[in-house]
Structures are given as structure tokens and as C-alpha cells.
């Protein structure tokens, strides 16, 4: 019997579920995750009209796509995940979907850059509750030997959402304006929210874990009950250290707003609010933090994923504008072109990463980070080759045709786009095995906090800032060179994930 302070929700399902229902739930979660990325990534395809409307530099647009979203998305994920470990995960996801979709629609009525910045923060508030609870649900619907593939299937929402946001958002913006694009995709999520709530049930926590079925750990002390000693001293250090992180993020946010010319009184208010959210979030997570943050594998996996996300989010957010500047494509053409790359390459890469890792993981747990480590080593040169393929085609006898150059570039871009997402299934599955079942949502949220604060916030801004920095030397081609410089993050990610492959076996929790 569990204590009331951390009891599972009363509606939790105790009876076994059928395979068909399990896959139905996975399909619904994939669709919700797709909407998550539609609303998150639509801003990339709308870069040109938004920059024109509000007269933004690349650096300012990078702040809009990065820190405006990531600052609240990353930090609020922890208290919402903590709540999901103690209450209905489905209710939390339903509310989150409604909030982020509503704020996406509000972006369509923004009358100034400051309003758009705040509405993008609202999108981040909602999306903070949409991922970690889903990871926990999947872990409780699928047994350990199927989790990497299930996580990979869930991650299909990323290329589906990126492609959908690019195609739908771009075409709507080209024909009806960018405001219509925001409103249309936002209202779609509001309509889907009731379906999620009414058809998806919370499964028994830890019910698919053989070890969990044999033992019932005390809810108040799940770590020690699973043979994992707690360390209250470390927990306090994690909580106190949160305020150092909060201070740094508050300073960064304040400087960002100051650089955008936002009224001075808003700067300390925003900074103080962000300080409080991050501090309270990590104080809430200190018990889980005392379990997973002592593990070297957690840091290597988290920082490795974050390094790759600097490129992943950055390239995904800026490639549409790159195609318009360097490939001379229109907004409608880019919508179809990049949507195809994101969809085909992304689906293949995610499924390949999960399938290969599950197969190799039966022999060695180190395969889970090793598969994406190898993938990233291949990604960097392939991106550079794809970006230069029109120039290479031009060296052919007769100079080649523009159509041939675009086709060749499309085919080459599929390779790094797929490999870029190969980490999602293996790494997220591995993180689920670094903590016992009652801590999985919070463990996932801490992982996502690191990944998104370093990856999403830094990545989107980095490429815009570097593009502005290089513009005096390279003009309209500055974005190309900015993306080149970012490829080093893939190499860093490979090194970190290679390290995780050597430590994961020791830290693994069945």
C-alpha cells in the first residue's frame, strides 16, 4: 500500500491491456507529439515574413525561436513531471496540449515583437507538460525489450511535426499570411485535446517491469527500495545549486530582453520569475536528482544529447531561410522541399536508431548511446556536402541544371537529417533505465531541462547570432557559414556518447 503523499492516481489501470490498445495509445501520443512540433517548429518556415513584419535581425529571430520558448519549456517541465509522477499523466498532457495550442493561435494576433515573444513563452509553458509524462506512459505500456522501438515510434512525432509545420505553415502563410498559419495550427490542437483525455488511460506504474512486479517499493523512498541508496546531502546540494543555475538563466534572459529593446521594468520581473521557476523546479526534483545525478551515464547522455540538439534544433530552425537565401527558393517551394526532407529523412533515422539499438542492446547496454555516437560522426560531413551540392553540380560539363542540383541536394540532405534524429529512441530509453519507475517522469524532465536549455535555447540563437557576426564578410551567405561552424557540436556529442557507452552498464536499472 502506498502512502497518500505519492499515491498513484485512482484512475490508474490495474488490469492488463491488449496489444491493440497499447498501440492505439502510442499512436495518439505520436499525434500529440506531432502537434507539439508543429507548433514549436512552425516559426522556422515563417522566418522571412516575421523578420519582414517586425524588422528583425537574425540574432533577434534566434532569440524568438530559442530562449522565448526554451526558458519556460525546459524549467516548467520539472514541476509538471513531478506532478505527473503523483497524479494523472493523461490529465496533465490534455491541459498542456490545450495551453500550447491556444498560445500558438494567439501568436497569430500579435501586434508587436514583444507580444509575439510573450506568446511564444506561452507555447513553451504548455509544451512543458507534453513530453515527460508521455515518456512515462510509454515506459508503463511497453516492456523493457520493446521500449527503444516504442520511444523511437513516439519520436516519429518530431519529423511528422516538423514536416507538417513546415508544409502547412508555409503554404498557409504564402497564400493567406503568417497570422492565418499560426491560428489554424493552434486551433487544431484545441480540437484534439478532448480525444486524448477521453480515450487514453493511465496504466499501472512500473507494471511492465519484471523487477517492479516482484517488489513494491515504498512511494516515499522508491530509490532505496529498489536497492539504490539515497543521499539527502546530495539532494540538498542539487536544490541549492538550482539557484545558481537560475541566476545564470535569469541574467541571460534579462540581457536578451534588453538587447531586444523591451521596456526596462519588464527585465527584472522576467528575470526574477525565471529565477524562481528554475529554483523551485530543481528543489522539487532534488530526490530524483540525488539518484540520477550521481550517475556518470546520466551526465554523458544528457550533455551528449544537448550538444547534438544545438545542431539539430538550430539547423531545423534555420534551413528554410537558408534555402530561400542560398538556393533561391520561394516560401511555397521551401515548404514542399524541406517538408519532404524532414519527413523522409526523419522517419527513417528515428526508426533505424531505435531498431538497431534494441537489437544490439540485447548483447550490450552500451549500444544505446553508441549507435547515435556513430551517426553524428557521419552527419556533420554529410550536411556540409549537401549544402554545397549545387556548387558541385555546377562543376559538371555543361554546368548541370538547377533542377538536378536541387534533386541531388534533397537526396544528400536525407542522410544527415535521418542520422541527426537517430539518438531519440536509444538515448531516451536509456534515461528511463537510470531511475526506478516512480521517478521516470521527473528523471525525463531533468534530462529534457539540460537538453533544451543547452540545445534549443543555445542552438536556435547561436546560428542567428553567428550569421549576423559573419554578415560583413559573407553577405547573404553568412547563414551558410554559421551552419558550418555549428557542425563541431556533432563531434562533441559523439565523444560524450562514446563515453556513455562505457559507463551505462554499471548505472542501468532493470
Where are these regions (language model features)?
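Conserved MFS/SLC helix-loop-helix module at the cytosolic interface between two early adjacent transmembrane helices
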Residues: 75-114
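C-terminal transmembrane helical hairpin of 12-TM major facilitator-type secondary transporters
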Residues: 369-426
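Helix-breaking motifs and short loop linkers at transmembrane-helix boundaries and internal kinks
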Residues: 55, 88, 109-115, 143, ...
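Cytoplasmic helix-loop-helix junction between adjacent transmembrane helices
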Residues: 119-158
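Central cavity-lining transmembrane alpha-helices of secondary-active solute carriers
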Residues: 64-81, 340-353
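Helix-loop-helix hairpin linking two adjacent transmembrane segments in secondary transporters
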Residues: 154, 158-201, 232-270
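Extracytoplasmic gate region of multi-pass secondary transporters
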Residues: 43-44, 242-268, 296-346, 350, ...
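Extracellular/periplasmic helix-loop-helix junction of adjacent transmembrane segments
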Residues: 46-75
Amino acid at each position: 500500500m502506498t502512502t497518500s503523499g505519492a499515491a498513484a492516481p485512482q484512475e490508474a489501470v490495474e488490469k492488463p491491456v491488449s496489444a491493440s490498445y497499447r498501440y492505439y495509445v502510442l499512436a495518439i501520443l505520436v499525434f500529440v507529439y506531432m502537434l507539439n512540433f508543429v507548433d514549436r517548429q512552425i516559426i522556422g518556415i515563417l522566418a522571412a515574413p516575421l523578420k519582414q513584419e517586425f524588422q528583425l535581425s537574425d540574432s533577434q529571430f534566434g532569440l524568438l525561436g530559442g530562449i522565448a520558448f526554451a526558458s519556460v519549456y525546459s524549467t516548467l517541465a520539472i514541476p509538471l513531471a513531478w506532478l505527473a509522477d503523483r497524479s494523472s499523466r493523461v490529465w496533465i498532457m490534455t491541459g498542456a496540449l490545450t495551453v500550447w495550442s491556444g498560445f500558438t493561435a494567439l501568436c497569430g494576433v500579435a501586434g508587436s515583437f514583444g507580444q509575439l515573444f510573450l506568446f511564444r513563452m506561452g507555447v513553451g509553458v504548455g509544451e512543458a507538460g507534453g513530453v515527460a509524462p508521455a515518456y512515462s506512459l510509454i515506459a508503463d505500456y511497453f516492456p523493457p525489450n520493446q521500449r527503444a522501438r516504442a520511444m523511437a515510434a513516439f519520436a516519429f512525432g518530431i519529423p511528422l511535426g516538423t514536416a507538417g509545420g513546415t508544409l502547412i505553415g508555409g503554404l498557409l502563410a504564402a497564400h493567406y499570411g503568417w497570422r492565418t498559419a499560426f491560428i489554424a495550427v493552434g486551433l487544431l490542437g484545441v480540437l484534439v485535446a478532448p480525444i486524448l483525455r477521453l480515450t487514453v488511460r493511465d496504466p499501472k506504474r512500473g507494471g511492465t517491469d519484471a523487477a517492479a512486479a516482484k517488489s513494491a517499493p515504498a512511494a516515499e523512498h522508491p530509490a532505496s527500495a529498489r536497492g539504490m541508496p539515497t543521499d539527502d546531502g546530495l539532494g540538498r546540494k542539487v536544490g541549492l545549486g538550482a539557484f545558481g543555475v537560475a541566476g545564470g538563466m535569469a541574467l541571460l534572459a534579462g540581457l536578451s530582453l534588453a538587447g531586444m529593446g523591451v521596456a526596462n521594468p519588464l527585465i527584472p520581473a522576467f528575470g526574477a520569475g525565471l529565477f524562481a521557476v528554475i529554483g523551485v523546479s530543481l528543489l522539487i526534483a532534488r530526490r530524483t536528482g540525488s539518484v540520477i545525478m550521481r550517475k556518470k551515464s546520466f551526465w554523458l547522455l544528457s550533455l551528449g544529447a544537448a550538444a547534438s540538439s544545438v545542431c539539430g534544433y538550430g539547423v531545423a530552425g534555420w534551413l528554410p531561410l537558408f534555402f530561400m537565401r542560398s538556393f533561391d527558393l520561394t516560401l511555397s517551394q521551401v515548404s514542399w522541399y524541406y517538408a519532404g526532407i524532414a519527413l523522409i529523412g526523419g522517419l527513417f533515422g528515428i526508426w533505424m536508431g531505435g531498431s538497431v539499438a534494441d537489437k544490439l542492446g540485447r548483447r550490450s547496454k552500451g549500444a544505446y548511446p553508441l549507435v547515435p555516437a556513430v551517426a553524428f560522426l557521419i552527419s556533420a560531413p554529410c550536411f556540409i556536402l549537401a549544402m554545397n551540392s549545387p556548387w558541385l553540380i555546377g562543376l559538371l560539363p555543361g554546368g548541370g541544371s538547377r533542377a538536378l542540383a536541387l534533386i541531388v541536394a534533397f537526396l544528400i540532405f536525407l542522410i544527415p537529417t535521418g542520422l541527426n534524429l537517430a539518438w531519440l529512441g536509444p538515448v531516451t530509453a536509456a534515461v528511463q533505465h537510470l531511475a526506478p519507475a516512480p521517478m521516470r517522469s521527473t528523471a525525463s524532465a531533468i534530462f529534457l531541462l539540460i537538453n533544451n536549455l543547452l540545445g534549443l535555447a543555445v542552438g536556435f540563437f547561436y546560428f542567428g547570432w553567428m550569421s549576423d557576426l559573419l554578415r560583413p564578410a559573407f553577405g547573404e551567405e553568412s547563414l551558410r557559414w554559421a551552419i558550418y561552424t555549428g557542425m563541431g557540436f556533432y563531434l562533441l556529442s559523439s565523444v560524450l556518447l562514446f563515453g556513455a557507452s562505457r559507463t551505462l552498464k554499471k548505472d542501468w536499472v532493470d
